[in-house]
Amino acid sequence: MTNSSPPFSTIHQFFPGNTFLNFESVRILSTAPYGGCDAAEFLTAIAAINPKDPQTWADAWSHMAHLAETMAEEALSRGDVVAARDGFLRASSYTRASGYLYINGPTLDEHHPLAFEISKKVQSLFRRALPFLDCDVHVVEIPYVVDSPERKEVMLPGYLYLPNAQHRLPDGKIPVLLNTGGADSVQEELYYIHPQGGHTRGYAVLTFEGPGQGIVLREHGLHMRPDWEVTGWKGYSSTLKREVGVELDLDRIAVAGASMGGYYALRAAKDSRIKACVAIDPFYDMWDFGTKHISGLFMSAWTGGWIGDDWVDRIIRLGMRTNFQLRWEVGVTAAFWGIASPAKILKEMSKYSLKGGYLEKVQCPVLVTGAGKSLYFDTEEHTMKVFDDLGHLEERWRRVWMPNRPEEGGLQAKIGAFGLANMKAYGFLDEVFGIRRVTVES
């Protein structure tokens, strides 16, 4: 045997020529090692999907969700809690997938008619699996005061995953990872990444949804904000301190997120109470990303005032008629920002940036990653600019991991390589927090 690279350079294409659907398919398959997908169910659903008809995607995954839920109910009736757990996890995962391609608008009335129902179903199915997981899981609520004249308080839903006695660290104290979501994920999907990898390593992991995300968007209509970290340390801290009888180490708190969640993690890392940050494939500047493939001449005419927003809207909407992915992307951003105009959506992107020295405020160790096969972010324009702006940190506490091949973590958000991503992330956190693990010979 040789150590040379195998004679392939890409990943299997479930839908040849459709990068978007291929990526979303691998995203679902990525949860298989941790209970979110079954190989035969996955392949059966894929075979039923016509890439030119988005409704077949919804129908295929809805069917698999119903099948998995039925299996879970049958297992539960017989006292087989392992099969019940697995069935409920898969049903929740497939339900999320079933609604993923629905087109939404800027107001709750303009969301897809099934959007809220699907969000609630994802949550309820997932919660039915919680009592049977191999860790303690507490459903928590984090208070958030809406930035409006009414100052209304909304309770943000979260899950706190705690390691069982078998996985506790020798010193008895439990380090904490705050795991943020991104633009289109839900926290039930986050379980398959850092939470399942954290509790088995002795970490507590807190996931939560904030403005513009998941059920918070669908139920309360709260829109995303660039300073997302204002969801509040006070709320996280009080939630963690309420865990009576559990010795959470509030001097060892880290934050992690992927894609847009990586941007949020970097913003949150400026808080001195955050002792480490893992930013998985974040963007550096959303405006640069959103306008990269638009003609420079056209951009100059628009930003220079020679053409107005109405012209930009017309051109983008013309493209939306024939390009489903563009139509879906505009719908997603319209929903989480509450903006109908494509031109105004692009302008909103300019608020989501780490330019201007923001990262100089970050004083904790940071691991930032990039993805050579990213569907969205160029590594030089995003990953390396983040890394360069962290130049004030000690070299040993400013790390970059930028794999290129899919099996090495080269897809956006480390899709298809969650296990490897956790090995890198928790290895870095162990080092920062001084956690030494006993080496075991095979």
UniProtKB/Swiss-Prot annotation:
Pathway: Mycotoxin biosynthesis. Pfam families: Abhydrolase_6. The active site is at S259 (nucleophile). InterPro entries: AB_hydrolase_1 (IPR000073), AB_hydrolase_fold (IPR029058), FrsA_esterase (IPR050261). Its EC number is 3.7.1.-. Transmembrane segments: none annotated. This is Hydrolase phmG. It comes from Phaeosphaeria nodorum (strain SN15 / ATCC MYA-4574 / FGSC 10173) (Glume blotch fungus).
